[in-house]
Amino acid sequence: SRSRGLGDVYKRQLVRLWGDIPLWTVLPDNNNLHKAKSPAKDVYAQIISDAQQAESLMNESLGIGYPLKFAANMLLAKVYMTLATNPDLGDGSSNYWQLAYDEAIKVKNSGRYSLHPNYSELFTQSGENSRESIFEYQLSEIASNSQLGRNYTPWKYKTGMHFGWFSVHASVYDSHVANYPADPRLDGTYLHYYTRADNNAEVKVYPSTGRNNFRASHPYLFKFAEKDKSHSAQYNSQNYIMYRYADLLLMLAEISNELSKDAEAMGYVEQVLDRVGLTPHISYQGGQASFRDAIMREYRFELLGEGEDSHNNRRRGYNYFLNNTILPHNNDPNKNQYDLTLNTDETRIMKLPIPLGEVTTNDLIDD
């Protein structure tokens, strides 16, 4: 049942990125190596069927680190939210916002989950498998099954074996600060100043320094960096949280807003922000459309880099993505020559092309 649920997670990742994909429901063999693409609508229907079966089979009382049946409910809620905002993927008759609510509220009402008191600690080994965690990958330096620390730890932040490739657009950081100037989540999410582990020299990137070269123009994403500066191994042991309770509360806020449950929607946002000593900003008070825009930004402030950014940006369609993500970035007054200009071509930015390696080895795919 857990393997079925994990398969659904991966199917969802694939269909979100590529749309129509080969849908494997049996293992390939010598007589079954090639598979034509199935419509994304059929892939989502299969995910729903599998997740419903996983929910019925998964245990409610396994030990620490094991996902419970409520992870399947959260997956179902996420899928129904996608179908609610993409009518061509659904059956044309279901109230997908209500279905999403019904699944998400099961997780909340289970009483199994709560917010971890310290936001930044979620991204350390001491914050692993907390009551906030709904589905968490168990990673180990000994098992050598995670490169997150190596890829996200800035250059010379620790003693060795890292690259520090991944930064955050300055416009994303600026938007976060503009909405919540004193947000404790800023320190848990971004890094822009540190001393090198080898010689104690200062390293500054934006906003701790000016934007006079590309490397210095964007803060690092700190969530998955190795926090132990004396660590020198290639792999590390910080787990990766796939689903957590704060995400569920924001989902319930978005869903409740679409169902005109105004007070309930605001209550979920208040729970998430109360953890970090904040209250909902003025955009939450401007009616359904204003609340919708605010909650879509809130996902970014709370969950940046945790696996849902690309989909949340695109889930409400091309025009919403263009007007709420791409153009605000491209027209940012703080933008300079060290910023990327985001593409606006719908045919190129909504879905990825099937990789050439798959096209050339699968006789039933030609594009």
Regions found by a protein language model. Give the residues of each.
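Acidic/polar-rich alpha-helix caps and helix-coil junctions
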Residues: 1-148, 184, 188-190, 194-367
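Extended polysaccharide-engagement surfaces of secreted carbohydrate-active enzymes
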Residues: 151, 174-178, 192-194
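Active-site-adjacent substrate-recognition loops and nearby beta-strands
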Residues: 148-154
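Short, cationic low-complexity segments
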Residues: 154-173
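Intrinsic disorder
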Residues: 154, 180-182
